[in-house]
C-alpha cells in the first residue's frame, strides 16, 4: 500500500470535489453511508462538467451493447455518460462490475458509493472523500469505528501509479455553515441538536487517523452445511470436525460449545435420515455419507434448512396449495431482503390507513392498528409451532429464528416479473438485494427438496425462477455454479443474458396468472366497482361484458360476494385448454 495523506475539509462538498479535480487528484470515491445519499449526490453532479466531449464519447463506446435492463439501469446509464459512477450493495452485480470496468479504464473521475469500498472492490482510486463520519448501523447512529475508517481510507492510492493516496474528511454541515457565517461577519444561530443524531469534529478525525484498530473478535457457529461439507471430505468425520474447531480462534470454552453443537447437529441429521453411518469405511476412510434419496448436491446452506427439510416431508403433494406452501417454507429460512419487506409493510399500512380514514376511525385507534401490520407472513403460526416441537429433539435449533415472508410466493400468485416487484414497491435502489434473495430461494429450492417431493408444478417454478434470474443478471447463478465446480466464472458467463420465454411456456404459472386475474374480477364485483372492472377488461380483452347489466340479477337476489381464502380455491375455476393447445 502507498502512504496516505489526511485532510479535514471545512469547504462544502461540491467545492471540495471540484477543487480536487482541478488539482488533478482524481479519481475520487465519495463515501456516503446511505444509498439514497450516494444516488442523490451523483445526480447533483450531472449538472457539473466533469468530462470532455471526447471522454463522453469514449464512455458511450464502452457502453455499446451493454443491456440496461431495469429502471435503475436507465438512471445509471445517464450518470455514467456524465462521468459519474455509483456503487453500493443494492445494485445488480452486472452494474457494479460495469462501474468497476469503466473506473479501471480511467473513464470515471468520480464514483459516489457507500462503505462497500471497505470490503475491497476492484476500483483504482487516488482520493477517498468521506462525506461524513456518522453511520446508522441498523440499531443506532454512531461514529465509524477506527477499523472501518482505516479499511475505507486504505483504498486511496493506486499501487504502481501513485506515490501517495489522499483521504479527505468533510466537516459536519453546521460547522461549514458556521465558518462561512464567521467569514462574512454574520452571527450564526446555534441549531438544536436532533435526538439520536451524532456529530463529529476535527478531534474525531484525528483520533480515527492515529488510533489503533479495535481488536477483532472471532465468531463461529457450526451449521448443517458445514457438517455436510466435512462429511464429503476424505477421512473420519470426527477428526475433520475436531481439526476445524480446535484450529479456530475462539476460546476453549467456545470450542467445547461448538463441539457439542456439532454433535447435536449430526445426531439430528442422522435421525432425519439425511446422513447414514457405514458398517465399513469407504476407501477414503469416510464412515458417514449423505443418504442416496436426497437431492443431488444437497445443500443445507441456511441454518434452519434441516428443519425445513423435515417440515417438507409432512406436506401433501396432492394439495392444490402445495407449491405455495413449499415456497413459504423455503422463504422462512432465507435471509430477509429488508428494503422489500419494509416496502411491503408500508404499502399494506397505507392501504389500511385509507380504509380506516374513510370509516372515520380516530387517529389513536388507527395508529394502534397500523402498528400491528407487518409484511405478509404466510404459514407463520404453523411454522412457528412446528419449530418449537422440532427444538425439543434438536436443541441446536434454539439459537435460530424463522423469518416468514412472501416475496417469491407473491410473485407466483400474482404473475409478477422482477420489474413488476421493483416498480410496485418503488425499490429501484435495492434491485441487487432483491435479485440475491430470489437467487437464494432458487438455490435453496433446487438443493433442498427431496426427489419424491418435486412435483411438476415445483419444476415449473424452478424453471421460471432460473429464467427470471438469467434475464436480469446471470452472474449470481454463474458464480454459484462455478463455485460448485471448483472454478472461477468467466466474464462471458457472468454477462450472459437469455431472452424472456413466452408467457404460455410455463403452464403452472400461466394458469396461476389466469386465476389471479379472474379473482381480481371477483374482488371488484364484490365491491360493485364496475367502472374499475371495465378499465381492467379494456387492458386484457378485445370483447368483454357489460358488468353492470350482467350483475344486476345477482345483486337483486344476494347481498354480497365472498372473497375469503376459500373463495380463492382452484376448484371454483375451470380453465379450458382444448382449443389446439391454446388457453
Residue ranges, per PLM feature:
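Short glycine-/polar-rich loops that comprise or flank the Walker A/P-loop
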Residues: 1, 25-26, 81-82, 108, ...
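Conserved interdomain linker/interface between the two RecA-like ATPase lobes of SF2 helicase motors
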Residues: 1-49, 78-89
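Conserved nucleotide-binding/hydrolysis micro-motifs of P-loop NTPases
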Residues: 1-3, 9, 34-38, 91-92, ...
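Alpha-helical "lid/cap" subdomains adjacent to substrate-binding clefts that gate access
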Residues: 45-77
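Conserved helicase ATPase core of P-loop NTP-dependent helicases/translocases
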Residues: 69-114
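Non-catalytic terminal extensions of ATP-dependent helicases
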Residues: 85, 104-105, 189-582
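SF2 helicase motor core recognition
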Residues: 96-97, 101, 107, 111-129, ...
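Conserved segment of the helicase C-terminal RecA-like domain
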Residues: 123, 127-183, 187
